[in-house]
Amino acid sequence: MTLIAFELSGETPEIPTAEIVGVLESENIPFSFKCQLEQVFIIETPGIDAGLTDILASRLAMTRHIIEVSGVSPANLTDIISMAEKVDFSNLNSLTYIVRAKKIKRKSHISSEDIERGIGKVLYDRGYRADLVNPCIQYRAIVSDNTCIFGPVIASIDSSAFERRKPHNKPFFYPGVLMPKLAQALVNIARVKEGSVVLDPYCGTGGIMVEAGLIGASTLGCDVQRKVLIGAKINLDFYSVNYSLMFQDAGSMALRNNCVDCIVTDPPYGRSALIQARSLDTLMQDSLCEMYRVLRPKGRLVLVSERPVETWAQNAGFRMADLFTQRVHRSLTRRITVLDK
Ligand SMILES: C[S@@+](CC[C@H](N)C(=O)[O-])C[C@H]1O[C@@H](n2cnc3c(N)ncnc32)[C@H](O)[C@@H]1O
């Protein structure tokens, strides 16, 4: 059994762990939950090969590093060094290394430099060679909740691609779009995988479809604004994803029953959005029934809203799987409702 630690980005507490679980489940990677520290999520697994590590690294939006845990100790220098002394570094062979320490929210009193120097000395004394510029292996010591988690980094997540896909950088921009990092995390929570059929019934400029399409899903989007749909086509073509767009109302979709694997959507909040001849409440109730109808059994819907939708969703037939809230600004807290059919 191998312990794997995910060093999480700090933006929200629960969404990063939910997306990890979503990816592990969608990729059929066997695992059991080990523990959760602040910004660190640890699982136990029979083993992750390089291919699966690459999949995790390419899909996770809110993880920074993935670490194979070699040692765990209380977060004081003496215990950290004696933990490092017990670690088997023999797989380093003649490879060079660097040791990096990260204190979560700077809570601990020990300095990162002392941890790096202390563990580095253990390796140096055993004859291993450090390379501070271009090391073959990075060891990471993460100090969180009075615990130090130590081991080699098996993957680091490059978030620059998410930056490049920010709404303003896309060929077509229209206000009210989710950031690609969050869109990708929601796609992961929905357990989308390569080959899945993913629907966004309120697709707007196609932000969610782009993220699902980039992991190899076939995407389907509906909207009732022609100019926005034309913009979605421009964006989806730009990223060369597999898509179909429909000019149709989310409250009555020309789709057959059980035909999509996952739904991820960000319906209008009812402020400036176009809703088409009825109240937002009626639209939400109608479209939740439609989403339930077109989703395959055991399929998952991840829905972003400002107001609670649980009762309508349960009336439509859905089972609540999770609920996350995310404060956007003083007058807007997003609700992310995860619903299973
Ligand atoms: C919050 S935006 C979605 C933004 C989208 N995630 C994106 O990447 O651009 C909500 C979208 O719902 C659309 N909409 C409003 N009423 C609708 C309806 N009855 N059926 C389908 N789409 C509708 C709006 O035109 C708008 O594009």
Tell where the protein language model's regions lie, with residue ranges.
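N-terminal, Lys/Arg- and Ser/Thr-rich interaction peptides
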Residues: V87-L92
